[in-house]
Amino acid sequence: MKEKMQRMVLSLAMVGFMVFGVASAMNNEGKALMAIKGSFSNLVNMLLDWDDVHNSDLCSWRGVFCDNVSYSVVSLNLSSLNLGGEISPAIGDLRNLQSIDLQGNKLAGQIPDEIGNCASLVYLDLSENLLYGDIPFSISKLKQLETLNLKNNQLTGPVPATLTQIPNLKRLDLAGNHLTGEISRLLYWNEVLQYLGLRGNMLTGTLSSDMCQLTGLWYFDVRGNNLTGTIPESIGNCTSFQILDISYNQITGEIPYNIGFLQVATLSLQGNRLTGRIPEVIGLMQALAVLDLSDNELVGPIPPILGNLSFTGKLYLHGNMLTGPIPSELGNMSRLSYLQLNDNKLVGTIPPELGKLEQLFELNLANNRLVGPIPSNISSCAALNQFNVHGNLLSGSIPLAFRNLGSLTYLNLSSNNFKGKIPVELGHIINLDKLDLSGNNFSGSIPLTLGDLEHLLILNLSRNHLSGQLPAEFGNLRSIQMIDVSFNLLSGVIPTELGQLQNLNSLILNNNKLHGKIPDQLTNCFTLVNLNVSFNNLSGIVPPMKNFSRFAPASFVGNPYLCGNWVGSICGPLPKSRVFSRGALICIVLGVITLLCMIFLAVYKSMQQKKILQGSSKQAEGLTKLVILHMDMAIHTFDDIMRVTENLNEKFIIGYGASSTVYKCALKSSRPIAIKRLYNQYPHNLREFETELETIGSIRHRNIVSLHGYALSPTGNLLFYDYMENGSLWDLLHGSLKKVKLDWETRLKIAVGAAQGLAYLHHDCTPRIIHRDIKSSNILLDENFEAHLSDFGIAKSIPASKTHASTYVLGTIGYIDPEYARTSRINEKSDIYSFGIVLLELLTGKKAVDNEANLHQLILSKADDNTVMEAVDPEVTVTCMDLGHIRKTFQLALLCTKRNPLERPTMLEVSRVLLSLVPSLQVAKKLPSLDHSTKKLQQENEVRNPDAEASQWFVQFREVISKSSI
């Protein structure tokens, strides 16, 4: 009995010690966590549950994960919380930690040496912060560590050789720092290392032959350092490599022959000083998807055997000194999307076999010595988006079959020997945004069809032999930013229609034979910063408006009869002409008689018309048809509107669109309205036009601008909309209002509102409606920055039984779905592509197209390099509390802009993801009246965790976000 009592007492004591030990450990870990929190800054609404007074259960704290048995802290995940401050040395007191993830914050200071005390650590990610100083040697004490990610900080010093003492290290990523010194050869003897990322540092030394000792290494990236020497001859022994990137260093010598033994998918050697020939053995590397040898000093011909690379999608050989012809065998590279051979010394003709490359997206052959014509077979490259042969010796004419290149946006044939007329068929390449035919021998007149290229940004026809008049149709180029027709033989007057071009930056007309006056209408081109009309035969007064004072006098020289303040010449009478001949006098007399007859007829008809109009006031009112669609405008007449706006005086103008001018009208006893005056008069099918307006007017949604009514008159068709106090999203991001800072919460609110409006059109309207021109300038913002979709002047209803509609060109350059550009068929997925571009604008603050830069292509290239976050607008990163939301929004934007429309989400799914990023309280407070489809999503989100819902949705579309897969 006594022995039993002793055993019981002993057992209770042991349990007591265990409980005390656990409690003591939890107490110590709780103190460590509070010390870690104390070293952070920018904690607004963050880590509120880290409170050891009111919540002692530290395992329930945000980002803290505990072991199920010992209840010790084993994982700390505070990634993408926008945390500032430093990493506390107290982190070393969490001895049982297996994972630390602090990436995507703004942590500064040095990495504490105490982190080496976390002996159980397997995963350490401190990337994308502001950490500086050396990498602590204490990290080498972490014998269980498998992943060390310190990329994109400001770390200095060498790569510690002691990292080789971590026996289980599989992934080492130190890219994007300021590390110096050589890469330790000991690092190459880590048998388990699989991923080595050292790009974007200042490392020196050479590539060691020991690099192939890493038998498990598949990713080797030292891009953008200061490495010298040659590529080791033993490079062919690196048989495990899948990605090999040694680009943008100072590597010299020739490419080793045995490099062909590699089985890499990506071989990037560009931006070095490599010499010699391209080894033919590269043509045997069947796994190659990307081959980049550009910007070196390679010589010799392009090996025809490269045509065997049937899986290669990108071939970059530009910026070398390659000679010889372009091998016709390249036409066998069936998956080739990018072929850049520019800036070499290639000769011969363009092989017709390139026309077999059905997936070719970009073909750049500029700055070589190519001769002969452009093969008409090139028009068979249905996906071709960019074609550049600038700076060659090509001749002949432009193939008429180019009209079939519906996806082409960039065409540069400048500085060659092309001749003949510019074919009218170029006007059928509807998606062109840059057309450069300068520096050739084109003759004849400029085709009027070029005025149909409504998405054109740059038109350069300079230095040719073009004659005839400058087409008035150029006034239809609503998106144009630059027109250059200098150094030709053009005659006639400067068309007044050019004054309609609201985006025009440069108008270069010098060295022609233009006559007449400079149109006053050009003063309406408020964005015009470069005007050159020198050396023509212009006369009269230079427009005296003040905005013309920004042009230098040199812009007007060489026109003897031009005068005005801007050119320093006082206007006086023109020189007396010589005495008229007898024949001239007879012609003048006959002309005067004819003119008098015409005036008499005009006066007579006018009097007859007045008699008809004076018949009754009711008939007079019939000339203008006013239709009120909502009762809030019913008390007003057309005369009220004209009186308030002084017959649409220009002082009431608040904006210009591609098809209209917009005025503000402040009516009494009602809210202000926006009046959109369409450029076109009565449409061909008036009944269809009115039916469409009535359909648009029937749409009532909090995120769609309401059409209150319309007026049809001979003086112009007017549409009456809600007036939006904060203008358009484009104005706030890119225009004169961009001084208004948009924080992340406001941008997300705008994205959610626009998505809900578009989802309503796609899923809740009967028949459903496709907007067809989603862009930032068509997203208007009220006084509360609530988004409203506008500009349904081109939207059409689609019967429920149809899945697509064929129509004329719609949309705006930079937002147009490439699939629509290729097939001319449009559906809901086209709107979703455009919405994805708007999301990218919100995230980056950049324009969809800026000069020649394309925002979508920029983000794709950064996705390739995993540097997308570098493109984020600073105002977003400063105000976003969870950078993970930004990454999700980038993912969503890239999914919306997938090349294959079938892989894009629906607007319901887009709304679901965006709503999941809005805190639940904000959703409840700021989105009180939702449409039916959005309410269903809200109900789902009440049942399930929003983040989990978003995660489930992303799983459905799971894949690596990279250029090759989008």
UniProtKB/Swiss-Prot annotation:
It comes from the Eukaryota. Mostly expressed in developing organs, including bud clusters, flowers, siliques and young rosettes. Also detected in mature aboveground organs, such as leaves, stems and pedicels, but barely in roots. LRR repeats lie at residues 40-63, 75-94, 95-118, 120-142, 143-166, 168-190, 192-214, 215-238, 239-261, 262-285, 286-311, 313-333, 334-357, 359-381, 383-404, 405-429, 431-453, 454-476, 478-500, 501-525, 527-550. The keyword DNA repair does not apply. It is a single-pass type I membrane protein. The modification Phosphotyrosine is found at residues 721, 760, 815. Residues 604-966 are cytoplasmic. PROSITE patterns: PROTEIN_KINASE_ATP, PROTEIN_KINASE_DOM, PROTEIN_KINASE_ST. Residues 648-921 form the Protein kinase domain. One of its GO terms (biological process) is stomatal complex morphogenesis. Its main location: membrane. The kinase domain is not required for ligand binding. This is LRR receptor-like serine/threonine-protein kinase ERL1. It comes from Arabidopsis thaliana.
